Amino acid sequence: MEAIDELSQLSDSMKQAASLLADEDPDETSSSKRPATFLNVVALGNVGAGKSAVLNSLIGHPVLPTGENGATRAPIIIELSRESSLSSKAIILQIDNKSQQVSASALRHSLQDRLSKGASGKNRDEINLKLRTSTAPPLKLVDLPGLDQRIVDESMIAEYAQHNDAILLVIVPASQASEISSSRALKIAKEYDPESTRTIGIIGKIDQAAENSKALAAVQALLSNQGPPKTTDIPWVAVIGQSVSIASAQSGSGENSLETAWRAESESLKSILTGAPQSKLGRIALVDTLASQIRSRMKLRLPSVLSGLQGKSQIVQDELARLGEQLVNSAEGTRAIALELCREFEDKFLLHLAGGEGSGWKVVASFEGNFPNRIKQLPLDRHFDLNNVKRVVLEADGYQPYLISPEKGLRSLIKIVLELAKDPARLCVDEVHRVLVDIVSASANATPGLGRYPPFKREVVAIASAALDGFKNEAKKMVVALVDMERAFVPPQHFIRLVQRRMERQRREEELKGRSSKKGQDAEQSLLSRATSPQPDGPTAGGSLKSMKDKPSPQDKETPEVSGLKTAGPEGEITAGYLMKKSAKTNGWSRRWFVLNEKTGKLGYTKKQEERNFRGTITLEECTIEEIPEDEVEKSKSSKDKKANGPDSKGPGLVFKITCKVPYKTVLKAHNALVLKAESVVDKNEWINKLQKVIQARGGQVGSVSMRQSLSEGSLDKMVRKPIDPEEELRWMSQEVRGYVEAVLNSLAANVPKAVVLCQVEKAKEDMLNQLYSSISAIGNERIESLIQEDQNVKRRRERYQKQSSLLSKLTRQLSIHDNRAAAASSYSDNSGTESSPRASGGSSGDDWMNAFNSAANGPSDSLSKYGSGGHSRRYSDPAQNGDAASPGSGSNRRTTPNRLPPAPPPTGSAYRY
């Protein structure tokens, strides 16, 4: 009994462990939530096998009906609990959490009445009882109907027998021991427990087969593990089964009547089965065998349960670490916790901002995406439209002609356009502010400590957001100051350079016009001198000057100028040819192959005609073209360089220059201008015409190209004194100013993000913790205590995990002790010797055992014929078998322990062979 009590404690521990592993509340009673199957005992057997009698013997009271009228017709489940304070005769029935003391007879008759009602029904609902006694082991007994009854089907059997830890009792009467191989109960047990690790064989009604030597021989063979092959791995126990009824009938007022009956049962069995192992006889042996099988099942389950408990313990400890310690109830402790939480929040904030965990990348994305796009989308074209420029200049200069003093108007235009940059700068600040606010919220959510105190978490987020608002205002002031700085001071050198470039352009135009006039006069003088010189081979000298001028010279007839350019494309839109390109490094000329695409408006060149990839490409839309004198190009070259690097430049007007309309931009690579020289005048004129056509078609500017025509002295003076076009001059100046504004906007696009980072991002990194500390320190103790109030859900979770942790430690310790004991017992049993053979005492030979099982195979023996093939018949049993000792007329027919001599055991060394 002590072994069963110990296993009961172990079963409770394993039930609690299963509840913990299933994450159930340890406060709730796990017995009702998760019933264990370690202590379940299911009785299997045919009608009349003595199942109820065996279970009555385990209970210690005849509560289950037996006999013909007490046949089990529905599953009866009795949940036993042992209470040592009760007397051996007391039985406490528990119904709906209420306890009531009942007698075994009243309980038995109540069950018999319930079973007899509706006997014709096929399906029966199970009957559940909860009993407390001082004699019963803490087991859950399941008394199933006879397996040969119609109401028993596979589903009913599986409902109780399929549990992995339920102990299966295969109960057969002694008279049928020789037919054990054909027992249905044994077949069902083998089906659900092939390895027989939770099966116990019970041979009942030994006293009724005391005179049948063959049956007793078969019983002794089974008890000695020498029965059929399918029975050798099952532990067998022999019982009489009616010791409880006998004790009840003979009991007086003594408390030890049950113990006396169990000892008498063991002595009677020893006298009947003299050759059987004495450790397998009687109710005490049955309890010990049950304890052994239950311990074996628990031994198999203990390692996995312990492993699960260890994993669960680690999870609980991690959860407790995440939830933190319990709050200290003091003003200083509360304030210290608040400041520590501020430090944790600041660490998470910095990690999200600079570590890449949060939305810190969105700050850089704003600088590289939205802000530059807003700067590019400013309406510069509308503000630098010529009509708008005229209006601004007139409003700024009053009624004075704007060509006399346009600087004031242009300064005003610069201020107006740069004012537009303030809105994108402010939007950039707002966008970064939103990103920082999101980072604050994400950091607060990622701080474990703040999750325990939602009010304080909201306070920290509010303080951090207020600090970010201050940083935002400072950043807006800074970026607006950057724009105002550019608006307030426009460098005077810019306007000085404007005037200088304008005067330089006028000077070049006048020089070009002067050279054209001088060339015309030289040509006239040359014609006059040739006309007056003698002509030996020509016609008669004389004639007018006009005739001499109109008549072409023979040299011109012999060498007509032909263009060397090539055209290609469906519409002749591609023009290619050689040009001399002036090198900025060597100050010399290099012959290059140039290709003009009129559709794309681009001019590219290669070193050789065979090359496929351009060495440089010029976008003509942004360029201007003008013709320059060769003297200006060649004035820095020595005569030796001219002979070595350049072609003969005696031909007039072969050089022209391509520049960008915006002075600050380059034309090709890092060059502000591209100086080219044609190989002939025809090539130059064709190149210039086509380049002018492309530039004009794409809205570019064409510089002044000198016309090669003879002008008189008067016409030259008239051209020099011609007034400058005011609109053209203003257009040119507005383009120069636009270039300056674009340069300033590009500078702002680079500097505004720096100001934003300084005033918002870096300020948040450096001053966020100080802002939190100063704000929290300014709050009173009462306010701090109201904020540091732990969430009740978190508090309950911590308490629950603390209870689980304590229970886990307790269960792990208890189960580890049992596991170590089981391991020690297993090693001891492995080292111990096998049980000795049954003692020899003369008498029958081993052939009696073999004949017993052979006769079972050939047919029933004579000694068993009076009971039929089904064993002992309940129909002819006396009322004493039902345990009703007080019934009328049953006193004389009471069955007592027979006083017979048992058959002699087989001789020493004999064994049954199959």
Curated annotation (Swiss-Prot):
Increased GTPase activity in the presence of phosphatidic acid. GTP binds at residues 45-52, 143-147, 204-207. The modification N-acetylmethionine is found at M1. Binds PtdIns3P. Interacts with SH3P3 (via SH3 domain) and (via C-terminus) with GAMMA-ADR. May homooligomerize or heterooligomerize. Residues 35-303 form the Dynamin-type G domain. GO terms for biological process: Golgi to vacuole transport. Residues 143-146 are annotated as: G3 motif. Residues 45-52 are annotated as: G1 motif. GO terms for cellular component: clathrin-coated vesicle; cytosol; extracellular region; Golgi apparatus; Golgi membrane; microtubule; phragmoplast; plant-type vacuole. Keywords: Acetylation, Coiled coil, Cytoplasm, Cytoplasmic vesicle, Cytoskeleton, Golgi apparatus, GTP-binding, Hydrolase, Lipid-binding, Membrane, Microtubule, Motor protein, Nucleotide-binding. This is Dynamin-2A. It catalyses: GTP + H2O = GDP + phosphate + H(+). The PH domain binds phospholipids. The PRD1 motif (721-728) is necessary for the interaction with SH3P3. Residues 730-823 form the GED domain. It is found in: Cytoplasm, Cytosol; Golgi apparatus membrane; Cytoplasm, Cytoskeleton, Phragmoplast; Cytoplasmic vesicle, Clathrin-coated vesicle. Residues 204-207 are annotated as: G4 motif. It comes from the Eukaryota. Residues 507-570, 629-648, 821-914 are annotated as: Disordered. Pfam families: Dynamin_M, Dynamin_N, GED, PH. SMART domains: DYNc, PH. Residues 523-535, 826-839, 852-866 have a biased composition (Polar residues). Its EC number is 3.6.5.5. The lineage of its organism: Eukaryota, Viridiplantae, Streptophyta, Embryophyta, Tracheophyta. Residues 507-522, 547-560, 634-645 have a biased composition (Basic and acidic residues). Residues 238-241 are annotated as: G5 motif. It is a peripheral membrane protein.
